[in-house]
């Protein structure tokens, strides 16, 4: 029966790809046996309860092979992937897009496609399982004991982010992470040996992984035995499964020609004959459905029923802990976070917003029991350490400080995996200039609606001596162009607390909080509440103003000083703090026009970064004072002076150009 079911996976994938005239049949045909073995003999899922917190997680890191996953989900009885949806593969509005999308199709545990990120995301899922198990499991009550499985390809293994995350997983000894490596020696451009020649298992052993070789990837039983062996390891496991890409296609198997193009009518006919498949396209025999029902759906429903009974008994035995867990899983715990949760500085005091952020992190940690995070080897520079907790590792599983190492990209993908798993709220920090290293993962945070909080410090040329390699210029503009994300650049400690509060109240997108190294004064009129509007009046001496200064972050205090200087010559100035462009854009037309009246054309923006965005607010007849060249190495005050961000220089520029 197993071979017939394996062939059904292959044929269903080939048929859907042919119908779409687009897709990647090679991985479907080559990896079908290992995927069948995993789904029918190991994977613990309930198609009727796709959000079961203790289900096994499955990540198809080789996301281009999406029809492999859709075939499995359809055959296993996941309602979102009906036969009609399989036929609509890669079509507008379907549940079967070109690459798997979390939240779009029930049964998909992660959005994948950008190679390498699936492996890395799975590391985060495994970390979440270990953390929650250590925190909530009690003797006889293993509420959290699931595995995280991955199918990846050569392209994933080549990607640097997979190396970063695999190294991290080994340090953390995430032994419930099992990666099935579809090793077929072919990539899109040809044979992998032309670009990729290392011994992958030796590499992973050097990281500290357990490794297993399956020489015959067509053997369901060999893969099954390897997974059984992996489950006994005290390390994460890489199972290298030697396969033939496009297996069964007489003229194209084993070649790059079957990687990313439909087989077509003629080759499909030969393929069907080769494997002895006589059914019409999309006609799956009843005994195949019965096989998957018995070995995936029914088995999974049985496992879920046992877990439900266990959870009910747990609630009776540990009612307070169960109540906390339910609040965490439903995100109801966020409701306990309020303005009163935070501490505030007095007007006239000064504090770097990175330090204000540290205060906020610890305020949030005091309220949310599963809130944790870390930094890419910069915790004492980013100020991301949760006080009273130590480093989280295999021996200290419930501590709340994660040392990600110098692995920005992996850090962000691990954060995504943690949030995809559920039951935690997480953050990660690095220098703002290094946000470029992780932007691919931040983009997937946004695409998957994941409320990850990114902490970016050292936000401008005020970094000073470290020079242009460490001084962000284009980075604010770049982050602001990513859809479905909030970017905050707070002006002082008050706005920083608000940014953290709003980041935790947000459940459908990531937040980037961009912070200073240098001290900033606590402003007289900065407002915790008004940050939610994205922009608000922070200084004004006359309702009859004729000039608007718009600023963010450290430049808000500068703008207020500039306003006072301009007023000496008769100008009447409104200063607007705009900590979040995205939140401001969500406001009503009336609020926007009230804040930035259309009849006031004397407008200036101040931000130590790329100036392009600001013409939207100051107009072509306004003045956008920014930095559109790289920074320099010198003491911070000298760099700031040379780049014209002093009261005198800004006032002179306004007078000369407006």
Predicted regions and their residues:
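Short, surface-exposed connector motifs at secondary-structure boundaries
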Residues: 51, 147-148, 208-211, 421-427, ...
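Conserved acidic/glycine
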Residues: 1-31, 151-152, 156-157, 178, ...
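Short glycine-enriched loops at secondary-structure junctions
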Residues: 89-95, 375-381, 388, 406-409, ...
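A short, small-residue-rich loop immediately preceding and capping a beta-strand
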Residues: 20, 56-57, 108-111, 141-159, ...
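Acidic-glycine-rich active-site phosphate/pyrophosphate-binding loop
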Residues: 1-10, 43-45, 82-104, 379-393, ...
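A glycine-rich helix N-cap at a beta->alpha junction
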Residues: 78-88, 171-182, 205-209, 446-461, ...
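Cofactor-binding active-site loop characterized by glycine-rich and histidine/acidic residues
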Residues: 30-172, 385-386, 414, 418
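Thiamine diphosphate
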Residues: 91-103, 121, 127, 131-135, ...
